[in-house]
């Protein structure tokens, strides 16, 4: 039994193939999805989508929020933005994280702190997506 996974962004189809399992970051925590999972519609948090392929190799996608629908072994993820871990430049991702952390230290009001924390969450998600599960 397999799962059909489709990850869509406003600009493109990022992933469209059969997989064994996924670990999905939702607003209420991570959920693991295997074949014959209960049908749900849920929001996606900023976080790393982990995908287990048939050869037991793991792949990652940095998700920047969105929605997902799981029904009849079909998983459709509508992401605000997404990037494959293998496409992320490690040096650039680390630099972006450092800039976001500096922005938090320099934040002068509540709005700047909230924006900086969100930037840190996005940047750290990209850094985490670089290294898939072994």
From Swiss-Prot:
Q: Which Pfam families match?
A: ATP-synt_DE, ATP-synt_DE_N
Q: Report disulfide bridges, numbered on this chain.
A: none
Molecular function GO labels: ATP binding; proton-transporting ATP synthase activity, rotational mechanism
The GO cellular component terms are: chloroplast thylakoid membrane; proton-transporting ATP synthase complex
State the annotated membrane topology for this chain: Peripheral membrane protein
Organism superkingdom = Eukaryota
Where does the record place it?
Plastid, Chloroplast thylakoid membrane
Per the record, the major location class is: plastid
Any idea which UniProt keywords this protein has?
ATP synthesis, CF(1), Chloroplast, Hydrogen ion transport, Ion transport, Membrane, Plastid, Thylakoid, Transport
Carries keyword Thylakoid? yes
SUPFAM superfamilies noted in UniProt: Epsilon subunit of F1F0-ATP synthase N-terminal domain (SSF51344)
Q: Whom does it interact with, and what assembly results?
A: F-type ATPases have 2 components, CF(1) - the catalytic core - and CF(0) - the membrane proton channel. CF(1) has five subunits: alpha(3), beta(3), gamma(1), delta(1), epsilon(1). CF(0) has three main subunits: a, b and c.
Q: Which family does it belong to?
A: Belongs to the ATPase epsilon chain family.
Q: What does this protein do?
A: Produces ATP from ADP in the presence of a proton gradient across the membrane.
This chain belongs to the protein called ATP synthase epsilon chain, chloroplastic
Underlying gene: atpE
């Amino acid at each position: 039994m397999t799962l059909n996974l489709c990850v869509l962004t406003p600009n493109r189809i990022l992933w469209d193939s059969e997989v064994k399992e996924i670990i999905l970051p939702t607003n209420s925590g991570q959920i693991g999805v295997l074949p014959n999972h209960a049908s749900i519609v849920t929001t996606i948090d900023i976080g790393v989508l982990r995908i287990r392929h048939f050869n037991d190799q793991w792949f990652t996608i940095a998700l920047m929020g969105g929605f997902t629908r799981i029904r009849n072994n079909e998983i459709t993820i509508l992401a605000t933005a997404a990037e494959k871990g293998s496409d992320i430049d490690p040096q650039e991702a680390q630099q972006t994280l450092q800039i976001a952390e500096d922005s938090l230290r320099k934040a002068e009001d509540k709005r700047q702190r909230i924006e900086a924390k969100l930037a840190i969450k996005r940047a750290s998600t990209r850094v985490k997506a670089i290294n898939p599960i072994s």
